[in-house]
Structure formats: C-alpha cells, structure tokens
C-alpha cells in the first residue's frame, strides 16, 4: 500500500512539473492554463519492440540497448507495457525456445495489443522464411490462443512477410458515450497509450463541438481523429500517403457506419496543389474538392513540427487543431500562427509518464 501511495505521489509530481513546463513555453502566446490529462502510471503502452539475444544452444532473452552507450539490458518484465504484453512475453519465449524453426535467426519480436484484449506478434528474422516456418508458427499461434484468446502471428524477413490469418488487431475506444472500433495494422503507426488516446479524442471532440462547415485533416493515419470528430462537422476530408493506413481508415469508416468522411491517398503538398487547381489527379476523379467548406484543419505532425510552407498554408483556416508531440517545435510554429490566430484552449496529455516527453493540444481561432 505504501509503495502504491509513493508511486502515485511521484507520478503527480512529474505531471505537475510537465504542466509547469508547458505553461512556461506557451506563456509568450497568451495561452490559457493547460487542461491536464493524467495517464495510468504503468502498463499504459499497447505496443513494444524487443531485440532477441541468443546465448548457447537454447537460451533466448528480450533485450534493449542504450542508444548512446550501446549497453545491453535484459528485459524480464516491462512495467510500462500493457498487462497482456507482460503475460505474453515469458510464455512466447518458452514456446519458441523448443522449436528450431521459430528460433533460428530470430532477432526481434514486436507486440501490438489492444484495450479490447487482442494481440498481434511479429517475429523478425535474419533469414528467408522457408516452408517449415508457417506450420510451426501456426502451432505457436494455437498454443497462445488457448491461453490468451485473440492472438495473431506475423513473420517478417528481408523482402518477405507471412501472415497466418490477420496482420491487424481490432481496438475499441470509448470516446464520450460512443464506442469506436479501429483496425490497427502491423508495422503502421498507432497511438501507443490507448487510455491517453481516448482522452485526446474526447478533448478534441469537445473543443470542436460548435464548429461550422467541414474539417480537413492532414496525414490521418487509420482515421484515429477523423472518425471521432466526424459528428461535429458536415463533412471530413482527410489525407494519408501510407497504403496500409488508408486501407485501415476505409475499414474503420465502414465498420463505424460513418458516412461523411472522405480519405484521399495523397501528400499535403499534393492536396494543396489539387485544392488550388494547380494540378489534376486521377485519384480525385468523382470528388469535387471545391464543394468542401473546410473552415477547420487538424494537424498532428512528427517531432520536427510543421515546415514553413505548411504553417503558411494552415493559416488560411478559421480554426486550427494542432496536436503536438514536441512542445519546442510547436512553439516555433506558434510564433507564426499566433500572428493570425489566438490560442483559445490548450491541453497537456501525459502520453509517456516518467519521461520528458510531452504531448499537447492547441486550439487556435482566427483573430
């Protein structure tokens, strides 16, 4: 009990420090006090990647390496990982140890799990997977399913991928009073902290509740935000360049019975060219871009933030929802954006507790 209280106190302390840091960073832009969303202190990561270390004839271990010193660390448990990842880890190695086909040249194992209790395990090899691998992997999957329920296995090697049944999991997220189902595809980006993702989607839905017109989202992934926000807009136009993510987004639109979201497989630069009538694209046949009244834009850039051209482009919109995984590059972008827009609301999402990482959201409205 004492440890639990101590751990909670430490968690609240680090969360408060992040809140102070974000408040200081946003102060030059006259931002309101950030709304703060806490994470579960442990078992919050729904995905993990481990290198596999071979010792002797039969021994296998999960390891991680220090990125600077290259020192090797054995991983016997993973407290930040989901409960399901931690339950799967020892049993999976136990089953692989006794099978030469599965064990030989195995160098990495990736886990993808869901709040809904599903798991996808990717086995990565420094060898070509021969005809013996698939039956061995099928037997492995059957053993795991007997103990853990909905588990799928994928094998990958150089220019080779073997999918036994599914290369995805189906997640169910609670957003307000709605349950949304999301296909999450192996080796594609998904939000790692599912509990925090639910809170992010809830906040984004709340800040856009009174919006008029249509929404544009750049690089929508599997439709994570677009689907949750669709109810607040007449229509949603979303761009994405990765084929697996586009496929997942189309599935998610259909399974959630959402009829006002259009996914375009194109880059932000291509979309801007199409919207300005500078270039025609065959993939846009039958889609009248000029009929959209996109007053609101959603951007969720990588750590590098938005490039100057994209910053200039999004300034044309009445409202901007900016989800950031790096407050420094967010602030760099805000130096330009706040020339034309005010920060109406902002939030801190503690995506990765006990790290320096800060996820944040900023809702900008034209002056």
From Swiss-Prot:
Protein EC: 2.1.1.-, 2.1.1.35
Enzyme class: transferase
Enzyme active site: 325, 359
Keywords carried by this UniProt record: Methyltransferase, S-adenosyl-L-methionine, Transferase, tRNA processing
UniProt-annotated binding residues for S-adenosyl-L-methionine: 191, 219, 224, 240, 300
Catalytic activity of the protein: uridine(54) in tRNA + S-adenosyl-L-methionine = 5-methyluridine(54) in tRNA + S-adenosyl-L-homocysteine + H(+); uridine(341) in tmRNA + S-adenosyl-L-methionine = 5-methyluridine(341) in tmRNA + S-adenosyl-L-homocysteine + H(+)
GO CC, alphabetical: cytosol
Record-level GO BP terms: tRNA methylation
Pfam families: tRNA_U5-meth_tr (PF05958)
One Gene Ontology molecular-function label: rRNA binding
Family to which this protein belongs: Belongs to the class I-like SAM-binding methyltransferase superfamily. RNA M5U methyltransferase family. TrmA subfamily.
General function of this protein: Dual-specificity methyltransferase that catalyzes the formation of 5-methyluridine at position 54 (m5U54) in all tRNAs, and that of position 341 (m5U341) in tmRNA (transfer-mRNA).
Stored PANTHER family: TRNA/TMRNA (URACIL-C(5))-METHYLTRANSFERASE, TRNA_TMRNA (URACIL-C(5))-METHYLTRANSFERASE
Name of the featured protein: tRNA/tmRNA (uracil-C(5))-methyltransferase
Species of origin: Tolumonas auensis (strain DSM 9187 / NBRC 110442 / TA 4)
